[in-house]
Amino acid sequence: MSTKDIFFNPIWDVRMTDTSLRDGSHHKRHQFTKDEVGAIVAALDTAGVPVIEVTHGDGLGGSSFNYGFSKTPEQELIKLAAETAKEAKIAFLMLPGVGTKEDIKEAQNNGGSICRIATHCTEADVSIQHFGLARELGLETVGFLMMSHTIPPEKLAQQARIMADAGCQCVYVVDSAGALVLEGVRDRVAALVAELGDDAQVGFHGHENLGLGVANSVEAVRAGAKQIDGSCRRFGAGAGNAPVEALIGVFDKIGVKTGIDFFDIADAAEEVVAPAMPAECLLDRNALIMGYSGVYSSFLKHAIRQSERYGVPAHQLLHRAGQRKLIGGQEDQLIDIALEIKREQDSGATAAH
């Protein structure tokens, strides 16, 4: 059976996934409470959001010293979300090497029905066994090719083929750094669509670090993407994700059906999601540097922490992280960069005297 048959639904042309409760976990330092998750899931479900992603920001098993500890165990939040949603499916993210096969099984037992497996865009092969397990369990599968801006479209399409052959039903172009600009999205999505045909759908996950999350998502749809991510109020890492409420407004205006009510999702963003945010997701200097330099969006909070600890500018940390082409999982190298900048500052002060 082709993906056209599996995913056909007369109420949408594009299926939306709200990732406020996963990508937003980065912005909230993984401190979601059960009350917040229950309220947000209920509001998104009422608005007609078909898929809601719930996990630690770094996926199953992400609660750790390296990534940050969760206030509430993620499996409890997945279970609560599944019990709260009346129509929406609950998705969960896992990164091979962070999460395990047992984590996937537990998430399914707690009500998760869509397994989203993420790898760096050149390492799709590490996801093969996890896709195999997810399909054996009867889970819907989605693949994330993170930091998709770092390799050309034809190389990305080859990696997408690895995921599709392993059992992935939709492969995402993931602009983890918010670094892609319009045609960069279009070319990558088109390459994946051409490679995968009816074997798997193509999706797009954008960030706002250059202010292009919505525009890039429109480009993705016009190039053939059938699944799109966003977060209410841009609740995500860096400057946040493409705001779902804005995406729905734009899609309504250009005739792309999503099945989500614009006014209900605007209400959810304003009245339910916003109060759960520690602050608005800002397109400030730090976020812009990440988009401009191609830095993984979740590095923001880690860079701010090391900036405060060592007394060095966060935007300089982020720029050097981009120069070194660091990827997700290498957040600890920000400490080395901070020490390097600190030494340069100290030697400069000494030389001045």
Swiss-Prot record:
Q: Where is the active site?
A: 26 (proton acceptor)
| Sites where the protein binds Mn(2+) | 23, 205, 207
Q: Example GO biological process term?
A: catabolic process
Key words of the record: Aromatic hydrocarbons catabolism, Lyase, Manganese, Metal-binding
Annotated site (Transition state stabilizer): 22
InterPro entries named in the record: 2-IPM_HCS-like (IPR050073), 4OH_2_O-val_aldolase (IPR017629), Aldolase_TIM (IPR013785), DmpG_comm (IPR012425), DRE_TIM_HOA (IPR035685), PYR_CT (IPR000891)
**Entry EC no(s):** 4.1.3.39
Where in the numbering of this chain does the Pyruvate carboxyltransferase domain appear? 14-266
An example Pfam family from this entry, by short name, is HMGL-like
Protein name, UniProt field: 4-hydroxy-2-oxovalerate aldolase 1
Q: Which organism is it from?
A: Mycobacterium sp. (strain KMS)
